[in-house]
Amino acid sequence: MSRQAGRGTESKKMNSELFTLTYGALVTQLCKDYENDEDVNKQLDKMGYNIGVRLIEDFLARSNVGRCHDFRETADVIAKIAFKMYLGITPSITNWSPGGDEFSLILENNPLVDFVELPDNHSSLIYSNLLCGVLRGALEMVQMAVDVKFVQDTLKGDSVTEIRMKFIRRIEDNLPAGEE
């Protein structure tokens, strides 16, 4: 009986490690395919955006979350439900701007960077930039334009990984004339 109970945890750990290693292989290949880190960063953001655009449907179906009424509620859903659901972590929400339109997600441990060390010749690589694109793409699908960027990264010697999110504007549905 105890053997069965341990397998579920072991399986999740294996899946997590496989995901981390596969992501590492993807970033390595992008570094070979593109001449500089800025191009790799753009490509990771673009790939993340495309994932986010599709992932939001799965998230909404699985989480049963309704429409968020403000950016603070959106931050809570992202940190407490989305990150937990897809990465198995719960980042803390800090550094709210006075206007309530900007905050930071602090990741004590970023599962994407397990087993990773940045080479010296890739000092401007934003290794986990895929996450910024995922957040931007998913939020755009629920009519929120946001700016998302890394401001701290444990791979670059910082004590935590910090993702800064800024609300830009609500996107209005542009329906063709005569349709509602």
From Swiss-Prot:
<dbReference type="GO" id="GO:0005829">
    <property type="term" value="C:cytosol"/>
</dbReference>
<comment type="function">
    <text>May play a role in vesicular transport from endoplasmic reticulum to Golgi.</text>
</comment>
<dbReference type="GO" id="GO:0030008">
    <property type="term" value="C:TRAPP complex"/>
</dbReference>
<keyword id="KW-0564">Palmitate</keyword>
<feature type="lipid moiety-binding region" description="S-palmitoyl cysteine">
    <location>
        <position position="68"/>
    </location>
</feature>
<dbReference type="GO" id="GO:0006891">
    <property type="term" value="P:intra-Golgi vesicle-mediated transport"/>
</dbReference>
<comment type="subunit">
    <text>Homodimer. Part of the multisubunit TRAPP (transport protein particle) complex.</text>
</comment>
<dbReference type="InterPro" id="IPR024096">
    <property type="entry name" value="NO_sig/Golgi_transp_ligand-bd"/>
</dbReference>
<dbReference type="InterPro" id="IPR016721">
    <property type="entry name" value="Bet3"/>
</dbReference>
<dbReference type="InterPro" id="IPR007194">
    <property type="entry name" value="TRAPP_component"/>
</dbReference>
<keyword id="KW-0333">Golgi apparatus</keyword>
<dbReference type="Pfam" id="PF04051">
    <property type="entry name" value="TRAPP"/>
</dbReference>
<keyword id="KW-0449">Lipoprotein</keyword>
<dbReference type="GO" id="GO:0005783">
    <property type="term" value="C:endoplasmic reticulum"/>
</dbReference>
<keyword id="KW-0813">Transport</keyword>
<dbReference type="GO" id="GO:0033106">
    <property type="term" value="C:cis-Golgi network membrane"/>
</dbReference>
<protein>
    <recommendedName>
        <fullName>Trafficking protein particle complex subunit 3</fullName>
    </recommendedName>
</protein>
<keyword id="KW-0931">ER-Golgi transport</keyword>
<keyword id="KW-0256">Endoplasmic reticulum</keyword>
<comment type="similarity">
    <text>Belongs to the TRAPP small subunits family. BET3 subfamily.</text>
</comment>
<dbReference type="GO" id="GO:0006888">
    <property type="term" value="P:endoplasmic reticulum to Golgi vesicle-mediated transport"/>
</dbReference>
